[in-house]
C-alpha cells in the first residue's frame, strides 16, 4: 500500500479532517509537549501532529511507511528502528485502523516509549461502517472498540490514564475523493453510511477515541 499512500499524500496534507478540528488540539495537549521532550509520531501521514508538537518546542521524529509523506524515518509501525525507551512519548493519530498487525505495532510503540503513549483512532461502530471503510479504502484493516483498546494496551503493560471521545463530521464527497472511490463502490459506501448522516448524505459522522496510557513502571 506504500505507493497508494504516496499518491494520496497531498490530499491528506490538505484534508480538513486531519489538518484541523479540536481532536488535533486534544492530541497535542495530551502529549504535553515542551522544550527537550522527545516524541515519536508514528504513521505521521501529512505531518499535522509533528508540526504542532514542534511549534511547542518538542523534539519530534516523524515515522511513516510511505515515501510521499516525507517523514523523517521511513518505516511501518510494526518495525520501528529505534532502541528501547528512545522517546518520552509516542503518538499516533487516526492511523491504527490501517496497521496490518495491531499487536505488533502496539508492542513496538510501547518498546520505544520511555513513559507514555497517546493514541487517536476511529471507534468501531458497526459492520456496515467497516464495510464502507474497506470499500472506500482497501488499506483499512479494522477499527476497534474502547474495550478492545483497553485490553490491548493493558496487555502490553500500560495503565490507561485518560480517555476522550470526539465526534467528527466528514464531507462525504471530499472523503470519497481523497481515495478516488467512485462508481459502484462509492454508491454502495453512500448506502452503508446513510444511517450516520443527518443531511441526506452530504456529511456523515464517526467517533474518534483518544487514549493516553503510561508504562506501568514509569
Label every PLM stretch briefly.
Residues 91:
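A conserved beta-strand element that flanks and buttresses the S-adenosyl-L-methionine
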Residues 122-140:
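Short, glycine-/aromatic-enriched active-site segment of Class I SAM-dependent methyltransferases
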Residues 94-95:
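Short catalytic micro-motifs in class I SAM-dependent methyltransferases
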Residues 103-117:
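A short glycine-rich, Lys/Arg-flanked "PGG" loop and its adjoining helix->strand segment in the class I
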Residues 40-79:
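Class I SAM-dependent methyltransferase SAM/SAH-binding core
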Residues 46-48, 162-218:
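Conserved Class I S-adenosyl-L-methionine
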Residues 142-157:
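Short alpha-helix
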Residues 1-34, 48-52, 167, 173-177:
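Conserved class I S-adenosyl-L-methionine
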Amino acid at each position: 500500500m506504500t505507493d497508494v499512500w504516496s499518491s494520496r499524500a497531498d490530499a491528506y496534507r490538505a484534508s480538513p479532517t486531519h489538518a484541523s478540528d479540536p481532536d488535533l488540539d486534544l492530541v497535542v495537549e495530551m502529549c504535553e509537549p515542551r522544550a527537550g521532550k522527545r516524541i515519536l509520531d508514528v504513521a505521521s501521514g501529512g505531518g499535522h501532529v509533528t508540526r504542532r508538537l514542534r511549534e511547542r518546542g518538542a523534539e519530534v521524529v516523524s515515522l511513516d511507511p510511505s515515501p510521499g509523506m516525507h517523514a523523517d524515518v521511513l518505516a511501518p509501525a510494526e518495525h520501528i528502528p529505534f532502541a528501547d525507551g528512545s522517546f518520552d512519548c509516542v503518538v499516533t493519530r487516526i492511523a491504527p485502523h490501517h496497521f496490518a498487525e495491531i499487536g505488533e505495532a502496539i508492542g513496538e510503540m510501547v518498546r520505544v516509549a520511555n513513559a507514555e503513549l497517546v493514541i487517536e483512532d476511529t471507534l468501531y461502530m458497526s459492520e456496515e461502517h467497516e464495510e464502507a471503510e474497506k470499500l472506500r479504502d482497501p488499506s483499512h484493516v479494522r477499527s476497534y472498540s474502547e474495550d478492545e483498546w483497553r485490553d490491548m494496551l493493558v496487555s502490553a503493560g500500560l495503565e490507561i490514564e485518560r480517555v476522550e471521545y470526539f465526534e467528527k463530521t466528514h464531507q462525504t464527497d471530499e472523503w470519497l475523493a481523497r481515495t478516488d472511490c467512485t462508481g459502484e463502490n462509492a454508491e454502495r459506501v453512500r448506502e452503508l453510511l446513510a444511517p450516520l448522516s443527518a443531511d441526506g448524505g452530504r456529511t456523515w459522522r464517526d467517533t474518534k477515541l483518544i487514549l493516553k496510557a503510561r508504562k506501568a513502571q514509569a
